[in-house]
Regions:
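Short hydrophobic beta-strand immediately N-terminal to the Walker A/P-loop
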Residues: 34-36, 48
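Helix-to-loop junction immediately C-terminal to a conserved catalytic motif
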Residues: 52
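The feature captures the beta-strand-to-loop junction immediately N-terminal to the Walker
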Residues: 37-42
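Q-loop/switch helix immediately C-terminal to the Walker
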Residues: 88, 92-93, 100-114
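Conserved beta-strand
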Residues: 6-9, 17-34, 65, 129
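A short, flexible loop at the N-terminus of ABC-type nucleotide-binding domains that lies
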Residues: 1-6, 10-23, 55-60, 76-78, ...
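Conserved ABC ATPase "signature" region
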Residues: 109, 113, 118-131
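Conserved ABC transporter NBD signature motif
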Residues: 60-73
């Protein structure tokens, strides 16, 4: 079973005519490491936002298709539920919603700190993700 499944995903930002995502179909298995690469404006950040519900939840553009995380449709669940399964580290740490952090480690640890995870466990979990 795929951990993340994308089915015919399309998205267009409000007040634009160009699709940011145009019919994407793929699966990511649990435990996989995946890099998303492409030119500026190719839809990399938009795709990541679709993984954790910012699209269509926060950005209200034209949305079609499905993103499923462990067979749960992202568009039909809450962002708080999705945050338990999917994290997002933005491209520029100084533009984070969480405030300016100095390192990638601090960015990854931010969510765990908010959940009250003990420091030793947090360090271990962040180290594991960074490997």
């Amino acid at each position: 079973m795929a951990y993340i499944k994308v089915e015919n995903l399309k998205y267009r930002y409000p007040n634009t005519t160009k699709l940011a995502l145009d019919g994407l179909d793929f699966e990511i298995e649990k435990g996989s490491f995946v890099g998303i690469i492409g030119e500026n404006g190719a839809g990399k950040s938009t795709l990541c936002q679709a993984f954790n519900g910012l699209i269509p939840g926060f950005f209200k553009g034209a949305y079609g298709g499905k993103v499923l995380i462990e067979d749960t449709e992202v568009a039909k669940t809450t962002v708080s539920k999705l945050c338990q399964k999917v994290g997002l580290v933005f491209q520029n740490p100084f533009n984070q919603l969480s405030g300016a952090k100095e390192t990638v480690f601090e960015e990854i640890a931010f969510g765990l700190q908010n959940f009250g995870v003990p420091k030793e466990e947090m360090i271990s979990r962040v180290d594991e993700v960074m490997e």
